[in-house]
Every structure is written in structure tokens, then in C-alpha cells.
Regions:
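Ser/Thr/Pro/Gly-rich low-complexity disordered regions
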Residues: 1-227
């Protein structure tokens, strides 16, 4: 209240990190002001100016506020998986779309897997942003759990969408079939398959015998068996 009258009131909000040196907040010229992340930990006050009926410039300053307290801001955006879900491929976590007004710390990535895309289990065999896919991953879908601690000490956690089910790639047969026994009339030859392996697994094994007179041209022997 001013007995000399009050003209148009000008409002200016100010900010200080120590309560002594004050700076005007650009654009903060309304009677209400909403603090944001950039103001956390600093004090605010408002300065009111007007010209009274006698032409005098009058200025009033409010007491300083207490330091602005942080309110956790939830992250926006989400991590996503890139790469091809197939054996011998790789799934890579892309975190470029994650943003947090409170700041983003160092990412920690763990993996989960599921054969149904509903019942997820921790997959402790892999950590980090890249999952190299091998035969052991075939038939499962994977997702990544991305976590970090923001600038104010709040731990945030985000999930990627599930990958497609990892597809199998045919793995070549390894090893060789060994023949034991004497190659003589009346003797028995045995096909030893103990050294044969296949990363895809061996569901069944069929043995067929062939004969050749010159080692180049082969024909099937009608009576075949394991020996």
C-alpha cells in the first residue's frame, strides 16, 4: 500500500546460489514462478517495482526463499534393441533416445530371456550393451534392463521391447566317420561315429554303405547297417 498511489507494477524474479549475489531470471516477470531443474539448490526472491503518484520509482524485494528442492523427474524416451535375432548375429542396446532432466549417469545393462516373451528370467551370462548370439541363444527372446543413477542419486530403470525369437543357423557337421576292422572278404567293417558332432545336435543317425572299384565312382550297397 502506498499513500502516494501505485502505478503499473513490474515484477522480476531473481536467483542466487549464495544468498548474496542475485541475478535476474530472464523472462520471469509474472507474479507466479515455477522452479525447474536448473534452479535446484538455489534461492529465489521477487523484486516489485512501480512509479508512485508523485513520480518516484519504488522498489520492494521479498525475503529469499529456502533453496529449491529437487523433485525426481522421470526419464523420457526408452532404450531399444538393434541387430538381427539370429545365431551368429548380435543384439545391441541403443540408449541414444533416453533423456532425464535430472541428468543421466553411467548406464548399466543386464539381460533377460524368455521362451514365451512373458515369463522373463535373468540371463547372467551376458552383461554390457552387446549380446553376441550363439547356438545356446536359439529359441529364446531377449530384452535388456538399462539402469543408471541420476545427478540427484535416484536410480532409474528402463526396459527394451523384446527381441524376436533368436533363429537357428545351420551349423556344419564336424569330425569324421572312422572305419575299423579289416577290408577283407569275410571280415567286418564298423563305422565309428564317435568323432562326429553337430552344434545343432544330432537327432538321428543313418548309415549307408557304398562301394567303388576305382575310389572315384561310388554306388550304394543294398544291404546296409551300422557295420
Amino acid at each position: 500500500m502506498d499513500d502516494d498511489g501505485m502505478g503499473s507494477v513490474q515484477v522480476q524474479w531473481q536467483i542466487s546460489s549464495d544468498g548474496n549475489a542475485w541475478m535476474n531470471l530472464t523472462g520471469a516477470v509474472q507474479q507466479s514462478f515455477t522452479p525447474r531443474e536448473t534452479h535446484v539448490g538455489q534461492q529465489l526472491r521477487v523484486q516489485i517495482s512501480y512509479v508512485d503518484g508523485q513520480g518516484n520509482l519504488e522498489t520492494l524485494v521479498s525475503p529469499a526463499s529456502t533453496p529449491v528442492e529437487n523433485v525426481n523427474d522421470k526419464p523420457t524416451g526408452a532404450p531399444r534393441l538393434t541387430g538381427e535375432a539370429r545365431e551368429e548375429g548380435a543384439l545391441v542396446v541403443d540408449t541414444s533416445l533416453i533423456a532425464d532432466e535430472d541428468g543421466v549417469g553411467t548406464y548399466s545393462v543386464i539381460w533377460q530371456r524368455s521362451s514365451t516373451k512373458t515369463d522373463w528370467q535373468a540371463y547372467p551370462n551376458a552383461v554390457g550393451e552387446v549380446l553376441q548370439l550363439t547356438q545356446s541363444h536359439v529359441g529364446y527372446s531377449y530384452r535388456a534392463v538399462v539402469s543408471y543413477t541420476d545427478r540427484h542419486g535416484t536410480k532409474e530403470m528402463l526396459l527394451t521391447s523384446p527381441s524376436e525369437t533368436v533363429a537357428n543357423v545351420d551349423d556344419p557337421v564336424e569330425g569324421e566317420v572312422m572305419l575299423t576292422g579289416d577290408a577283407a572278404e569275410g571280415s567286418t567293417l564298423v563305422a565309428n561315429t564317435a568323432r562326429v558332432s553337430d552344434e545343432d545336435g544330432i537327432a538321428s543317425l543313418t548309415i549307408g554303405w557304398e562301394s567303388s572299384e576305382d575310389g572315384r565312382n561310388w554306388r550304394a550297397i543294398e544291404t546296409s547297417g551300422a557295420s
